[in-house]
Amino acid sequence: MDFANERRAMIDLLVQRGIRDRRVLDAMAQVPRHAFVPENERSFAYSDQALPIGEGQTISQPYMVALMVEALQLAPTDRVLEVGAGSGYAAAVLSRIVAKVHTVECREALAERAVALIQALGYTNITVHIGDGTQGLPDYAPFDAILVSAASPWVPAPLREQLASSGRLVIPVGGRQAQILLRLRREGDTLRTERLCDVRFVPLIGGHAWTAERYPER
């Protein structure tokens, strides 16, 4: 399969769907999404859809990754926290735009797989942490931007607290079936919140989001 042509077609689709930040488009043109999906899903790697990656998790559709990264309004010197590393794909995209990416994954198997892949692909400005991403990473805070790649019933307090002055936080917030993508921006002592669009994500599991006790039964 000609992944290079498939990737170019994906970028063309992102432009058609309204992605305008050239840095985001260039980053996604550089990162081999097919490397981040299971071998049996690789023929769909550059289609605009979420794909299973194991452990009940998915790699987000390319448009959603582009939309969320664009919404962060990143600068080259930014330090970014991603909550929900998953396959490591979004962290790889972020790493092509900013100085440093910290990404947290609560599922050890996914985290270990992401570490191996990130190292194999030569991304040197990404650190993968295993743990509860809803706690953030206080030892590395504050962050210029925080991207949450799973849905929470609310904005976790530790993430709000770890946002730098003028920092941006993009997160899906809502119930089990549907959420709203929010962007929060720190302005002095306040956080200004914008509603971006309706979305549907896998649940964010952790002490400050969904837990086994809190998460609604099927």
UniProtKB/Swiss-Prot annotation:
PROSITE patterns: PCMT. It is found in: Cytoplasm. CDD domains: AdoMet_MTases. Keywords: Cytoplasm, Methyltransferase, S-adenosyl-L-methionine, Transferase. The active site is at S60. It catalyses: [protein]-L-isoaspartate + S-adenosyl-L-methionine = [protein]-L-isoaspartate alpha-methyl ester + S-adenosyl-L-homocysteine. GO terms for biological process: methylation; protein modification process; protein repair. The keyword Metal-binding does not apply. GO terms for molecular function: protein-L-isoaspartate (D-aspartate) O-methyltransferase activity. InterPro entries: PCMT, SAM-dependent_MTases_sf. Its EC number is 2.1.1.77. It is an enzyme of class 2 (transferase). GO terms for cellular component: cytoplasm. It comes from the Bacteria. Catalyzes the methyl esterification of L-isoaspartyl residues in peptides and proteins that result from spontaneous decomposition of normal L-aspartyl and L-asparaginyl residues. It plays a role in the repair and/or degradation of damaged proteins. Belongs to the methyltransferase superfamily. L-isoaspartyl/D-aspartyl protein methyltransferase family. This is Protein-L-isoaspartate O-methyltransferase. It comes from Roseiflexus sp. (strain RS-1). The gene is pcm.
